[in-house]
Amino acid sequence: MKATHTKQAIREAMDHLIDRATNFDIDALDSIYHQDFHTTLVMPDSTVQTFNKVEFKEHFAKQALEGQTQLNTWADWHDFHILGDSAVCVLTRKHSGMNGEEMKLLCNIELRFEDGRWQVLREQIFLRPLSEG
């Protein structure tokens, strides 16, 4: 197994994503998110929002311009799975960056190893009130 294709390497890529996204580092997100990036947010009322790479970076840039402070970096790691140059990370997050309210985020993150680094290709995020546990 390549040293880059380990659970530890995926965890490091995800830690980097969390650190840069929670600090609204749009330049870093440009290299973290794959050119074909797509995210799906399922809101608590079951409405769905989708973003491509440009749109999602704009979402973070807007929060930075509005003076949003650093988002919560808390994460609970559930699973890492690597298959060739693809990987999936399943985790739970807590932060207010998706809708302005501190929420629990159930995340399924797909990564692709390309250009010598892991890049986030897809995110499926289900937002739930913190009161749900």
Feature map (PLM): residue ranges:
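Short, cysteine-centered beta-strand-loop-beta hairpins and adjacent loop/turn segments enriched
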Residues: 96-102
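Residue-level signal for tight coil/turn positions that link beta-strands
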Residues: 84-86, 115
